[in-house]
From Swiss-Prot:
Prosequence residues removed at maturation: 23-34, 77-92
UniProt xrefs under Gene3D superfamilies: 6.10.250.2190
Free-text comment about domains: The mature protein is largely unstructured in the absence of a cognate ligand.
Swiss-Prot/TrEMBL GO biological process terms: amylin receptor 1 signaling pathway; amylin receptor 2 signaling pathway; amylin receptor 3 signaling pathway; amylin receptor signaling pathway; bone resorption; negative regulation of bone resorption; negative regulation of osteoclast differentiation; osteoclast differentiation
Descriptive protein name: Islet amyloid polypeptide
Source organism: Cavia porcellus
Record carries keyword Secreted: yes
Record-stated family: Belongs to the calcitonin family.
Subunit structure: Can form homodimers. Interacts with IDE and INS. Interaction with INS inhibits homodimerization and fibril formation.
Pfam families, per the entry: Calc_CGRP_IAPP
Residues with Tyrosine amide modification: 73
Length: 92
């Protein structure tokens, strides 16, 4: 019976410490929303574009920076409707 007390005590202590850590982190952050992380390739492309735009000012070409990332607007894929699907909806 004594052999079971130590693992049970350690398990209870471990659960209590994990609960304590979880409550302290949750109370520190409050209701803040974290910024979404972007794709590595997207971030690298944006940094390279911004660097090239800044360096081009020294050469005389003034290009506008290109916004690339998850928060930018761009062309969206529209659903394609074929002619056969349109004919199905027409009354005969």
């Amino acid at each position: 019976m004594c052999l079971l007390r130590l693992p049970v005590t350690l398990l209870v202590l471990c659960v209590a410490l994990n609960e304590l850590k979880a409550t302290s982190i949750a109370s520190d952050t409050g209701h803040q929303v974290g910024k979404r992380k972007c794709n590595t390739a997207t971030c690298a492309t944006q940094r390279l574009t911004n660097f090239l735009v800044r360096s081009s000012h020294n050469l005389g070409a003034a290009l506008l920076p290109t916004d690339v990332g998850s928060n930018t607007y761009g062309k969206r894929n529209a659903p394609q409707i074929s002619d056969r699907e349109l004919l199905h909806y027409l009354p005969l």
